[in-house]
């Protein structure tokens, strides 16, 4: 019986302290979500910048590959034209 009364007393104290805490919230606890929002925005901005940099690097690599392919195609076409002209000259 004494143990159960002690337990009931603990529960009453617990709920009483919870009620006081809810009625008077800690100002620092309220400031934490507000401080976390700029971090999320800066993280999103950093991720966007990294994505843009990656996309720019991929575009530059693609352009360089296309330029190499175009130069190779032009060289092959010139060689084929020269071979055709030489064969036509031989008759």
Curated annotation (Swiss-Prot):
Belongs to the type-I AFP family. It is found in: Secreted. InterPro entries: Antifreeze_1 (IPR000104). Its main location: secreted. Detected in blood serum (at protein level). Keywords: Antifreeze protein, Repeat, Secreted, Signal. This is Ice-structuring protein 2A7. Contributes to protect fish blood from freezing at subzero sea water temperatures. Lowers the blood freezing point. Binds to nascent ice crystals and prevents further growth. Residues 1-21 form the signal peptide. Residues 22-39 form a propeptide. One of its GO terms (molecular function) is antifreeze activity. GO terms for cellular component: extracellular region.
């Amino acid at each position: 019986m004494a143990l159960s009364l002690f337990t009931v007393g603990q529960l009453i104290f617990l709920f009483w302290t919870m009620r006081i805490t809810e009625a008077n919230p800690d100002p620092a606890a309220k400031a934490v979500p507000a401080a976390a929002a700029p971090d999320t925005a800066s993280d999103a901005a950093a991720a966007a910048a990294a994505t843009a940099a990656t996309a720019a690097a991929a575009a530059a690599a693609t352009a360089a590959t296309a330029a190499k392919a175009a130069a190779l195609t032009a060289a092959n076409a010139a060689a084929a034209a020269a071979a055709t002209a030489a064969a036509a000259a031989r008759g």
